[in-house]
Amino acid sequence: MSSAIDNLFGNIDEKKIESSVDKLFSSSCGPINKLEVKSKTRTVLPDSKKRERAAEADQEEKEASKPDVSDEQTEEVALPKVKKAKKSKRNDEDEDLEARYYAKLLNEEAEAEDDKPTVTKTDETSVPLTSAAKKVDFKEDELEKAERTVFIGNILSTVITSKKVYKEFKKLFGTNPIAETEESGNEKEEESSKKSDNNEFAIESIRFRSISFDEALPRKVAFVQQKFHKSRDTINAYIVYKNKSAVRKICSNLNAVVFQDHHLRVDSVAHPAPHDKKRSIFVGNLDFEEIEESLWKHFEPCGDIEYVRIIRDSKTNMGKGFAYVQFKDLQSVNKALLLNEKPMKSQKQEDENTKKPTKKARKLRVSRCKNMKKGTTIGTGLDRNGLTDSQRTRAGRAKKILGKADRATLGQEITIEGLRAKKGEGSTHLKKKKQRSATGRVTKRSIAFKKAQAEKSKK
């Protein structure tokens, strides 16, 4: 230090140098450290937040004092955004860090509980809640009724007209057929068994079908007036039993039984006897008015017959000219084939008094039944895409067993009390009147007629 001063100012007397100044220049601080400069904290005034709030309040008062502006102008002109003052300190930015962290944890736990699978009735049935009120009609009541129903064919039409014949018919199918054939020694046991059998073979209802009428009247009117077709004197019937167990016994014991000189065909509706083509023959070239009893007597010498079926028209109930005969034994078919191209005596072609043929006997065409391919299935208005396997099974079974009327309404939704009606769901069953053309001939004539009537009234 002294050498530098000596070079500038020359030799200086040490006595003249002040000691305090000499100590100040002799001690040096050295170079400045950059880290020490950056680590210095800034002082923030405590009233900065209050100033910001006061500025925002003043700005709101100014906006409220301004006159109202229309909606269109407010949409076009956007108000200038107020810039928020930046927080001066990092600690101020992270004041709510801990509170936000715990809130995030609580939200994650709540979402995890919501995502857990809950076992409910809707998951088990895989059906939405909205479809609980809707019910598809699968005709379960009609299917259960078909299990207790027996079909009886080739019945004499006097069952409808005569009360005596009707009582005999009801007694035949209302009692146990096995008890009549078996003989028992004790009369008391017979009476007790008959009472129990009568309960088992109790009839719920009897309905007659395939009735041919002489005049083209409504069926109810023609039935009340008993205007039946003279050449079609046989009908069919359906008997509904109260117990399901009676159907099998009735079908196995009363099939091919003679009632009023007619062989009855008895079969179950739900479980009909299978059509065995090996034991059956096809009979063609029949008269349209031919009856089943003529075929029974013609083919009875060939062997025991299981049933005779003449194919008839659904509207007129008259024959179509061919039939099927099924035997109980396979060997009977070979004997029946020998009757090919041989005439058959018909009861309809004989005079009642002289019993002589009124028409020439027809030569029958007898052949074996062929293996025909199945035709197209009977269509229904049922959408099967939204059904389960069990529902499809029930729908397919109902389609085979039920009649035309029940098949048409199969699979439709049942209206439940309390549901709102929607447009297009129900049918009014009324024909909508077509609007008349504005330029048609009818409108022109009506306008001219109205004008003529108006002129007459003025005169």
Curated annotation (Swiss-Prot):
Post-translational modification Phosphoserine, affected residues: 70, 184
Cell compartment(s), UniProt: Nucleus, Nucleolus
Organism domain of life: Eukaryota
Biased composition (Basic residues): 356-373, 429-448
Region Disordered, annotated ranges: 38-96, 340-394, 423-459
Keyword set, alphabetical order: Nucleus, Phosphoprotein, Ribosome biogenesis, RNA-binding, rRNA processing
InterPro entries assigned to the protein according to its UniProt record, in alphabetical order: Nop12_RRM1 (IPR034777), Nucleotide-bd_a/b_plait_sf (IPR012677), RBD_domain_sf (IPR035979), RRM2_Nop12p-like (IPR047189), RRM_dom (IPR000504)
Modified residues (Phosphothreonine): 181
Positions with biased composition (Basic and acidic residues): 47-69, 342-355
The keyword Disulfide bond belongs to this UniProt entry's keyword annotation: no
Annotated CDD domains: RRM1_Nop12p_like, RRM2_Nop12p_like
GO cellular component: nucleolus; preribosome
Alphabetical GO biological process terms: maturation of LSU-rRNA from tricistronic rRNA transcript (SSU-rRNA, 5.8S rRNA, LSU-rRNA)
Function: Involved in pre-25S rRNA processing.
Family: Belongs to the RRM RBM34 family.
UniProt-recorded name of the protein: Nucleolar protein 12
Taxonomic lineage: Eukaryota, Fungi, Dikarya, Ascomycota, Saccharomycotina
Gene name of the encoded protein: NOP12
